[in-house]
Amino acid sequence: MATLPITLRGAEKHKEELHRLKTIERPAVINAIAEARAQGDLSENAEYDAAKDRQGFIEGRIQEIESKLTMAQVIDPSSVNAGGKVVFGATVELEDEATGDAVTYQIVGEDEADLKLGLINVSSPIARALIGKEEGDVAEVQAPGGVRRYEIVAVAYR
């Protein structure tokens, strides 16, 4: 079975969602199904159908999260000792050589990625170009508009 890298923060978010689904959402939908059943004829009961659909979604999401946590390789970026190299979990400050713009990204797992928050997927083109490089190195990234060159200004593990 393959392992999926995930940061400690990402694993905690999954655990929180799983707890909420099991302790709040699941009991609420079970009550909604019971109330809809009490109304009688189920063949034309929209509330019952909606509650059953919601139950299916919740159970599916619970299974999905449990599966991901089972396969997860949880990595705490603050405990990584990569000697200044860019690795999974690292926070990297870059400077676009063409524009001089500075940008900061943290390399995270697939489910954690959110570009607006500066969290990039470990399998994204920019992350793949950065992995293994060090402060002062230049990474070339194939972008839709052509090759972009980024100088690595700083690497942190937090």
What spans do the regions from the language model cover?
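Context-gated lysine
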Residues: K13-K15, K22, K52, K68, ...
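Structured, basic alpha/beta domains of bacterial-type, RNA-associated proteins
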Residues: E59-S79
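Non-DNA-binding regulatory cores of transcription-related proteins
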Residues: I75-R158
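Helix-rich terminal scaffold detector
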Residues: M1-Q63, R158
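Preference for short coil/turn "hinge" residues that link or interrupt alpha-helices
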Residues: H14, E35, S67-K68, A113-L115, ...
